[in-house]
């Protein structure tokens, strides 16, 4: 189990953040369309079933995360690793039902992921619901430094 340290915030446009990553030698590790279904079980835990669509292929992943619906920019929460379940959806649905997870909502987005050292940018252009979100996560000291730099640039 990992403890995630993340700044997450809404933005007007994602392009300046993509340009920031590219100009500062962040490596693009993924660009894909995603759908994510969120499930809650009343214990402040979310189950997330994420479908990544890359080059016409679909891969499905399951992970768990502490529920954190605050408006705070900084979020610190526990997060499991993810497991690929592309060929195991019958099992996943059975597991969610047995653990009393109920469907909460579905998200659709295009996600860009950039990484450099211990810092990862997840830049999301949501189609449903309509929104643009940037998340910066990783090592506390490095993430704090990058977030401070971004904040001072007034993107």
Residue ranges and their predicted role:
Residues 28-29, 131, 141-144:
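Short loop/beta submotifs within extracellular cysteine-rich repeat domains
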Residues 139-155:
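Mixed-charge, glycine-accented linear interaction segment located at domain edges/termini
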Residues 1-119, 153:
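N-terminal strand-loop-strand beta-hairpin
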Residues 89, 133, 144-147:
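Short amphipathic alpha-helical surface patches that serve as generic macromolecular interface elements
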């Amino acid at each position: 189990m990992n403890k995630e340290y993340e700044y997450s915030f809404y933005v007007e446009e994602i392009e300046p953040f993509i340009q920031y990553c590219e100009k500062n030698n962040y490596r693009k590790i993924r660009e894909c369309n995603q759908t994510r279904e969120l499930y809650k079980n009343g214990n402040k835990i979310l189950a997330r079933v994420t479908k990544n669509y890359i080059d016409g292929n679909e891969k499905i992943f399951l992970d768990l995360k502490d529920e954190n619906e605050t408006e705070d920019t900084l979020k610190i929460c526990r997060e499991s690793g993810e497991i690929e379940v592309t060929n195991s959806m019958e099992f996943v649905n059975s597991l969610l039902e047995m653990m009393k997870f109920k469907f909460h909502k579905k998200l659709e987005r295009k996600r860009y992921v950039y990484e450099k050292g211990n810092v990862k940018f997840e830049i999301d252009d949501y189609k449903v619901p309509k929104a643009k979100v940037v998340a910066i996560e990783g090592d506390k000291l490095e993430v704090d430094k990058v977030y401070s730099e971004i904040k001072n640039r007034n993107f």
